[in-house]
């Protein structure tokens, strides 16, 4: 599997210097993720997830992009309502669209979500906007994670570098 989920931590005294060591246990799991935005980055990220054995539900405003991935075996959806309904709860939804359209997408997406769902902004949004979005969604019980994504279209083969910001609960999922 190519993705791992944090399964727990333990600490003990370092034998050299006496400081505290934080040890993390990792466990490979199969997960389901919804991907909104099937441009070059979003489509390849979905492919990498699926190649790693994960379940990926996809949506894009461009029906041809959805059809192309559906032909590769993805669960393709044609509306946001269908997309959200197809995902198991609690949902993890990765939004991989240009920063200029994230707020507009959230205006439509958030009313369809439930408590404990997670929205991941993987695009190039300014981090202060993502901090504000997280503050807005927290009272609704929706987690928001900012994940700057680097790797470009070559990430399909080489992997991606992810710079993650958000609450521990959401990141731990």
Where are these regions (language model features)?
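NAD(P)+-binding Rossmann beta1-loop-alpha1 motif at the extreme N-terminus of oxidoreductases
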Residues: 24-91, 116, 153-156
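Short glycine-/small-residue-rich Rossmann-like dinucleotide-binding loops
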Residues: 97-99, 124, 149
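Rossmann-fold dinucleotide-binding core
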Residues: 105-107, 126-173
